[in-house]
Design a protein with these regions (language model features):
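Short S/T/G/P-rich N-terminal loop/turn motif that feeds into the first structured element of a domain
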Residues: 1-96
């Protein structure tokens, strides 16, 4: 496998539910601390919003090297849980 394919960034769509309101959650997502945590894993948030049918369902699109989203969640799971993120509702899909 060539290096260029291994280092290629992929787009990942993640959806999940939150217990708080979107306005509260987005303040955390847009914070400097979240930016630093994302940058540690070379994750670039491209979009964050909520479902028009369910304002507690969040949809995020990120760009990162393959596998980095999973590494981010493993390294930051307690921090993420503290922001009322329901891991049991998380769905993820990726494209290269």
């Amino acid at each position: 496998m060539s290096y260029s394919l291994m280092s290629r960034k992929i787009k990942t769509v993640i959806s999940f539910k939150i217990e708080s309101r979107f306005e509260e959650w987005v303040k955390i997502f847009d914070s400097k601390e979240a930016d630093l945590r994302h940058s540690e894993f070379d994750i670039k948030p491209l979009f964050r919003g909520f479902s028009k049918d369910d304002p507690k369902k969040i949809i995020c699109i990120h760009q990162s090297p393959k596998g980095n989203i999973q590494k981010f969640f493993q390294a930051n799971s307690e921090w993420i849980k503290s922001h009322k993120f329901d891991f049991s509702t998380m769905e993820e899909s990726s494209e290269i």
